[in-house]
């Protein structure tokens, strides 16, 4: 199990990313638009820098929904490999069959 504080921190970051997504996208579009003047683009960059750091999607970490484990994360199931194995062996994941060859 991951520390509760790190899981909660990541949840807070996810909330901030969602909250500032529109504003961040607009400012990035202005900053990257080469038809605008350099002053306008620079102003957009400054406003972008004023946004909270944790509102950047880069700062999010994919974590297991069950254990909070940050590594060995499968995007399709939003779980770590360990949780997938445990739930799969119990038959709790529909369509998941143990492989044998």
Curated annotation (Swiss-Prot):
GO process terms (BP): translation
Keyword Ribosomal protein: yes
Domain of life: Bacteria
Gene Ontology annotations for the cellular component aspect, listed alphabetically: cytoplasm; small ribosomal subunit
PROSITE patterns with a match to the protein in the record: RIBOSOMAL_S14
GO MF terms, alphabetically ordered: rRNA binding; structural constituent of ribosome
UniProt keyword terms in alphabetical order: Ribonucleoprotein, Ribosomal protein, RNA-binding, rRNA-binding
Keyword Ribonucleoprotein: yes
InterPro entries: Ribosomal_uS14, Ribosomal_uS14_bac/plastid, Ribosomal_uS14_CS
Task of the protein: Binds 16S rRNA, required for the assembly of 30S particles and may also be responsible for determining the conformation of the 16S rRNA at the A site.
Subunit-structure text: Part of the 30S ribosomal subunit. Contacts proteins S3 and S10.
Recorded family membership: Belongs to the universal ribosomal protein uS14 family.
Protein name stated in the entry: Small ribosomal subunit protein uS14
Species this protein is from: Beijerinckia indica subsp. indica (strain ATCC 9039 / DSM 1715 / NCIMB 8712)
High-level lineage: Bacteria, Pseudomonadati, Pseudomonadota, Alphaproteobacteria, Hyphomicrobiales
